[in-house]
Structure formats: C-alpha cells, structure tokens
C-alpha cells in the first residue's frame, strides 16, 4: 500500500509574506505626492519664519502647488474636456486664486490638505482592496502532486480537475477539491470566518488557502485555479467595488449642477461687490473661500467608502455581496422568505425508507441513475445512498423544477417526482407517500415508462442555528420570517414549528414561490429571499434582494442571487443584514456631517469673516472625517458574530 505522503523533493521557495506594517502605504502614488507636498510646505513655512528671501519662500510654496496639485488639476482638465465639472478643479482654481492676491501660504495649505485628503481616500480604497486581495496570498504557489505512486512538486496554477494532491499536516491547501483519503481538521476561518476547525473526511470538500490540521489528506482537485472559492471571492468583491450605490448615483447626478452653481455663485460674489467699488483683494479672498467651503467633496465621499468597507468585511466572514446596490437593498429588508431544503435544513437529507412496488425492480438504482446529474439536495442524497453499487448510465436528463427529474436509463424513461407531480391513481403510492409525510419526511415517486415502481422516503434535519437565526431575523425586520417550499405540508409544518416559523406556504412550484413574493411586494414591502436550489431562482429574481446558500447552492441560484454565503450557517443572514443597516447609518451620518460642515462654513463666509486657512481646514477636515468614518466598517467589530443579538 502506498504511503499517504512519501518523501518528496522540497518545494521551491514560497512567495515572501506580505509585510504586516504600514509599509504598503508608500506603494500608493497619491501618498507619496502628498508627503512630498507636505515636506515642501513645511520647508517653505520654516523659510518664511526664518526670514528667508521672498523668492525662496514663493519657490518652495509654488513647488508645493505643482507636486500636490498636478494630478487633481489634470483630472479636472480631462473632466472639463468631457464637459463635466470636477470638484478637484474647483480646489485648484481656488488655490491659484489665493496665490494671485498674495495668499500663497493659504493656497499651499489648501493644496497640502487637499492632497492629504485625496491620499486618505486612496488609502481607504486600497485598504479595502487589500483586505480582500490578501486572500489570494493565502493560497500556496506550489502543490504536491500524486501520480503513479510518486510525488512531485508542481505550480498550483498548473493543477487541473482530476489531479490528486497530498496535503501534509500544517500545510495550506493549494486547490479546491474533495478528500479521497485521510482525515483531519481544517482551519477555514480565512474563507468562511468560522472560528473552529472543520472536521474533514473522505467525501468532504476543502478550499484553497485553508490550513490543514494534524492529519494528512489526499485531495482530488475539482476546480480550475481561477475558479477556486478564494479566487471567486476576490473577483466578486472586485466587481462589487466597481459598482455604484443608488445613493451615490443620485449624488453624482446632482453634483454637476451643484458644482456649476458654486462656480456661478463664486463669480457673483466676485463681480457684484466690485461693481459697487469693493476692494479687489478682500472680495477675491471671500469668493475663493466660498468656492472652497461650498465644494461637495465630503458629500461625494459619504456613500461609497462605508458600503465598500462593509462589502469587504462581509467577504472576510464568508458572505459575498455582489454590488453596492445589493448592500443598500439588504438594509431595506422588511420580510425574509426562507426556502426549506438546504436553507432552513442542513441540505443533507438521507434515505429513510425505500418501498418497492414491483418485484425485482431496482428502485434505488433507477432513481440514482436518473438523479446523477441533479443539483437538488434530495437528488444528491439518492445518489449518495446508491454509492458502492453499479448505477447505469443515464441520458436525455431533464430537470423538472418543482416536480423532479426525468432521464433515459437502459432504454426506459425513468422519472423521480414529488407526490404532487404524480398524476396516477395508484392507491399504494398515495398510501406510502402519506405514511412518509406523516413521519415528517419527504417522499418521491419513482416511475418507469410512466408506471410507479417504488417510493423513496427522505428525511432532513434542521440546521442547529436555524431557530436562533429565525428569532434574529424577526427582531431585525419586526416581521416574522416566512417559509416557502415545494415540500409537503406535513413535513414543512413540522420543520417550521421546530424553527419557530408560523407562516408556512407548502407544495409550491417555482412560479408559485415567485407569485407569493410578488404578492408580498405589492404594498411596497421589501422582500429578501434566501434559497439554494434551482427552483428558488424565480422567487429570487422577483424579490427586492436575495441570498444564495452558496456552499451547496445550485449554479443558477448563485448567479441569480445578489448575495452568496460561503459560510454554511443560516446565522450569517441576520449578520449581513445587520451589517448593511450599520453601513446605511454610517452613510446617513456622513451625509449629515458633510452637509452641516458645508452649511456652517458657507454661512460663516457669507455673513461673517471666515479666514481662508480656517475654511480650508474645516472643509478638508470634514472630508477626512467622512472618509475615516466609512473605514470603521472594515473592523471585525462591525460584523455581528452568529449567535449574537443584532441591532
């Protein structure tokens, strides 16, 4: 017998660990430019205080202008070419205006604070990206490939589905796959956020980037390197970061008109007093101050940093929010609709009984052959129960959403359907189905060429965290969750009672689920649908927003859903809703903070004497505070651990 992991040549040097210090900050270009501008400003200030010649002082301050202002100026000019008015350009014009009246110090201060504010924005964005992209560094670059009784070290990027790799104790797993040998416990916290290691045995799935425990494993690769869970997490969050929230789109829509209004008001503040003989210097100074403090920099930053930080935080805990719009919509949730199998239950049903109606019929074998391409948990349970026996090949496979499956097996049309989809009058079939359902199980009828040959009973178990999750959802939404299922009324009612759900709608086809969701939403109720099967996709598409239980979820469901959970816990649903609501509160707080700062500074400038340096500090300071406030949602404290009470 071949050892699980015989001696093997040492792996090439691994990639260097990413530094944990703040050294990465210097990789952000805007940080370097802001630091250089600050250095020039401080040097100019020192020269001014020491009585250096004016030419030297001006040279240093103007150099600060160039270093700190060239990039926003270029961005503003390009925007102007596209007939849009960028806030950055207003800041540069104000700084130049200050220099023209001899206030080069104030203009340089504006440039430094503005450059620092922009650098902090970029740091916020980069930190959000790094918090997600850092997951890619968890996956090792090399793997130990097993083949023909020997082992060799290969690049993890060269692994393909079907390859078998060896994972030693303490090593990181280099690919997504299924355990085919050995047993261990795996630390999956980097992917799913689960705090405790998960036991892994033959048949269990493992993910790239997770850490093997004390046992050795043989793993059959099941996904291409670009399609691993960790790679898809990064891809999804990157795509989400490129989207814009509804609030942000509205802000950007009015920003152009508002900015144009600021320019018009600035020109009016400059020209009207001059027409009545006002002093040029003081009038220009007031107008420039107005342009600075009225600019909507903080308002523009109020929305996206909190939402993107929340998306990054959720991804670290095994929940992928596909867009900023989805994060906003999660916060709107009024009612949560749950599927049963694979959502409220563990999605791992087992065969409880097999009844043969025709002597000699291989009921389980026929059903397993027809179900071998099915993604439904009941189908997978039937296939798993037939493991170890010879199952014939099936062709012409057709999924019948909400009803069952059909396939051609050994020249016969075999169907595995729900009792509701069985149109026959066989009394024995009805009797056996009723007995299974009375016990709280789920029955399926096996047909061969239209004739019933057997009945299979399956039983599923409630997720351990389901009752607590249902209670949390009711507390969050102020409305008890609803259960929509295609299963029989007895089984659905029994399970719903265990979970604490009173509103149960059973024996629904996919279009029936969608119709129920649409009915709920007619009175402007925002419905969140949580499901995992193909038959949940229509209801998800009809809902305000949707979550797919992605670990066992069907591909169509995962594609349709706005949110995908990798962590196999129903408690992540109230947790991500609570995070979305916290993000919304931060957005509102940011908008109030930004609006209050702009209003206060504008009124002070119009009806008082607002010094330019104070206006600059107040305006840019509020912008920085808004950006930093959004970054708070990157903290693990912002995520409510499953089991905690959401607010």
UniProtKB/Swiss-Prot annotation:
Record InterPro entries: ATPase_P-typ_cyto_dom_N, ATPase_P-typ_P_site, ATPase_P-typ_TM_dom_sf, ATPase_P-typ_transduc_dom_A_sf, Cation_Transport_ATPase, HAD-like_sf, HAD_sf, P-typ_ATPase_IB
GTP-binding keyword on record: no
Transmembrane segments: 33-53, 55-75, 94-114, 260-280, 291-311, 587-607
Cell membrane listed as a keyword: yes
Residues holding Mg(2+): 532, 536
Gene3D superfamilies per record: Calcium-transporting ATPase, cytoplasmic domain N, Calcium-transporting ATPase, cytoplasmic transduction domain A, HAD superfamily/HAD-like
UniProt main location, coarse: membrane
Membrane topology designation: Multi-pass membrane protein
Keyword terms of this UniProt record: ATP-binding, Cell membrane, Cobalt, Magnesium, Membrane, Metal-binding, Nickel, Nucleotide-binding, Phosphoprotein, Translocase, Transmembrane, Transmembrane helix
Places the protein is found: Cell membrane
EC number: 7.2.2.-
Catalytic center residues: 339 (4-aspartylphosphate intermediate)
Catalytic activity, reaction form: Ni(2+)(out) + ATP + H2O = Ni(2+)(in) + ADP + phosphate + H(+); Co(2+)(out) + ATP + H2O = Co(2+)(in) + ADP + phosphate + H(+)
SUPFAM superfamilies in UniProt: Calcium ATPase, transduction domain A, Calcium ATPase, transmembrane domain M, HAD-like
Mutant lacking the gene: phenotype: Cells lacking this gene are hypersensitive to Co(2+) and Ni(2+) and accumulate these metals in the cytoplasm.
One term under GO cellular component: plasma membrane
Pfam families for this protein: E1-E2_ATPase, Hydrolase
GO molecular function: ABC-type nickel transporter activity; ATP binding; ATP hydrolysis activity; metal ion binding; P-type cobalt transporter activity
Induction: By both Co(2+) and superoxide stress.
Sequence similarity: Belongs to the cation transport ATPase (P-type) (TC 3.A.3) family. Type IB subfamily.
Protein function: Involved in heavy metal homeostasis. Probably exports nickel and cobalt ions out of the cell.
Protein name as it appears in the record: Probable cobalt/nickel-exporting P-type ATPase
Record lineage: Bacteria, Bacillati, Actinomycetota, Actinomycetes, Mycobacteriales
Gene name per UniProt: ctpD
